[in-house]
């Protein structure tokens, strides 16, 4: 992941 602001679960 590059530049992840909000991880999607």
From Swiss-Prot:
Modified residues (Phenylalanine amide): 9
Function: May act as a neurotransmitter, neuromodulator or neurohormone.
Disulfide bridges in this chain: none
A GO BP annotation: neuropeptide signaling pathway
Taxonomic lineage: Eukaryota, Metazoa, Ecdysozoa, Arthropoda, Crustacea
GO cellular component: extracellular region
Predominant subcellular localization, coarse grouping: secreted
Cell location: Secreted
Top-rank lineage group of the source organism: Eukaryota
Tissue-by-tissue expression: Limited to neuronal cell bodies, neuronal processes and sinus gland.
Keyword field: Amidation, Neuropeptide, Secreted
Protein name in UniProt: Peptide tyrosine phenylalanine 2
Family: Belongs to the NPY family.
């Amino acid at each position: 992941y590059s530049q992840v602001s909000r991880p999607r679960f």
